[in-house]
């Protein structure tokens, strides 16, 4: 326990526009310390500085409040809320299907995981989990694993940039563009596509989808090897990451940390293995771990996880080739959002063929389509918790229904929010420069933290 005698005599707070006062106070302290005996009296001076929320090294609008003594961090706290968008509250005023458009924008670097967790929750409430077409589940897995690779590439790129490895940033974003191009081909959008829907996916793969993915599978392994050759044995990279941001298994369990940070302690915890969903139990892949408990171990885990994701994508491509023509949306027309939309010749709206199919199939089908789009599906009352393994850890959703066409409550357990609790444990007692490394190894996304 800290006693009053151990506390600093004076704390100087640096806000943003008070630098002149800080300099003046520091000079006064320096002058007084020249007197006999004053040096020892002021030896414990501390300064509180704000790193962020505009700092380029804080992964968005994260504010780190650091109390430093010299170059040593004595206390570290996180200031969040600068990117609050009220998504969870907005979901209470939208239909169950419209909610996908909102949740995909939370953790904007891994949108397919947000969508999948949401849809799995809705499907569990509806009791149709086992009725989802296999082809739709395979597409979900493929899109999530491609998304995992793109998210890890951003983590390595931004982490490298913050430590001065600009080449890593260029390589990471270059390879990510290849994956975003695949997303655009399949969903029409590079990010935030709302492609995964309750009951399946919005549309089947286009003709050019699988060939583009096959080309990606031949190119990415070589590109990833380039990044490994650049950083794995790089003297400066290892000096900045080895032993930095240390957090052991006890600390992770106490704070509820998941994802690469937890697996860097040697614990092989991965929901794809321990609580499989979307048929993950039928895929062949390994859970990557490391026992260093530091930033370098987390870097290695992300690099190796990308290779495991490529293995899963290869298996998905093989299954999709065998299931061409199979449905990608649940067959119950009272629940199924139309999954065969086609763009008209003007590039807007739906094609005449699609409209004719809806209106000419049956009067009952037209009524169901109208009610589905205007009112939305009715979900039986109840509550569920569903979790998926996102690039940052356990992404959970607690969903409550009161039997209506809109959620009563949807709460997300975002791993970025939970993992930020580790900042103090990782940074306190270390150098200011090492705080950058520690935060980069957590890889928080503030859209998911603040929601």
Swiss-Prot record:
Citing just one GO molecular function, the answer is:
NADH:ubiquinone reductase (non-electrogenic) activity
SUPFAM superfamilies for the chain: HydB/Nqo4-like (SSF56762)
Give the E.C. number(s). 7.1.1.-
Question: Mostly located where?
Answer: membrane
Instruction: Spell out the reaction equation it catalyses.
Output: a quinone + NADH + 5 H(+)(in) = a quinol + NAD(+) + 4 H(+)(out)
Q: What class of enzyme is it?
A: translocase
**Cited PANTHER family:** NADH DEHYDROGENASE [UBIQUINONE] IRON-SULFUR PROTEIN 2, MITOCHONDRIAL, NADH-UBIQUINONE OXIDOREDUCTASE 49 KDA SUBUNIT
* Protein name, per record: NADH-quinone oxidoreductase subunit D
Gene symbol here is nuoD
